[in-house]
């Protein structure tokens, strides 16, 4: 004979201390739904920020006449760092979108889509690798933006943001969004690590 609380079964005569909390299946269900909802929101935000980085970089062009007959043009591909960021942001954008779809399906069905250990490890590793690669690329682009803004006296590089203010402003916005995307990917990586831990312990 026992006492039923939700879906939990607590035998009569068992010792439960006043501070104890019995976790029911309903509470576990709510926790899973919340985590899957957060996972979807974070991944869709990562997709949106990476897409914004791509759009800003591709459309960031400014042409300036500095003297009669002398026209200069500033583009993202004038240096290597933004080019690398564009390529990596494109990869991360596609990956984040696919993972967001998988996460949404998992949330709707209350069941992990593609739920096996190999894919859990693959998701964990890809999240980790892309997070660090995006962080490195964003940092390199931030350095390029700083040099464009301030110059570098040691190697006699002059600041170029005087005649290209709009270009530099958009460039700075791109760097900012890149780091926000890194944060979103880092949170996604933490969630996938948690899923992998639960998988290794035999949980759903």
UniProtKB/Swiss-Prot annotation:
One of its GO terms (cellular component) is plasma membrane. It is a multi-pass membrane protein. Residues 1-36, 106-117, 192-204 are cytoplasmic. The chain crosses the membrane at residues 37-57, 85-105, 118-138, 171-191. Keywords: Cell membrane, Glycoprotein, Membrane, Transmembrane, Transmembrane helix. Its main location: membrane. Pfam families: CASP_dom. Glycans are attached at residue 77. It is found in: Cell membrane. Residues 58-84, 139-170 are extracellular. Homodimer and heterodimers. PANTHER family: CASP-LIKE PROTEIN 2C1-RELATED, CASP-LIKE PROTEIN 4A4. Belongs to the Casparian strip membrane proteins (CASP) family. This is CASP-like protein 2U2. It comes from Selaginella moellendorffii (Spikemoss).
């Amino acid at each position: 004979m026992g006492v039923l609380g939700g879906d939990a079964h607590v035998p009569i005569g068992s010792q439960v201390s006043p501070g104890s909390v019995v976790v029911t299946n309903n509470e576990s269900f709510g926790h899973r739904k919340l985590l899957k909802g957060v996972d979807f929101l974070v991944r869709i935000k990562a997709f949106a920020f990476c897409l914004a980085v791509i759009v800003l970089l591709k459309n960031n062009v400014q042409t300036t006449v500095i003297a009669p007959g002398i026209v200069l043009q500033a583009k993202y591909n004038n240096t290597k760092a933004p080019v690398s960021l564009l390529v990596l942001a494109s990869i991360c954008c596609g990956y984040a979108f696919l993972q967001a779809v998988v996460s949404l399906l998992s949330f709707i069905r209350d069941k992990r889509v593609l739920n096996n250990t190999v894919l859990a490890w693959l998701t964990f590793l890809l999240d980790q690798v892309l997070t660090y690669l995006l962080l490195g690329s964003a940092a390199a682009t931030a350095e390029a933006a700083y040099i464009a803004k301030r110059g570098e006296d040691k190697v006699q590089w002059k600041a170029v943001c005087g005649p290209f203010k709009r270009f530099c402003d958009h460039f700075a916005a791109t760097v900012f969004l890149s780091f926000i995307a890194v944060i979103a990917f880092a949170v996604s990586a933490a969630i996938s690590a948690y899923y992998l831990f639960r998988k290794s312990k035999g949980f759903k």
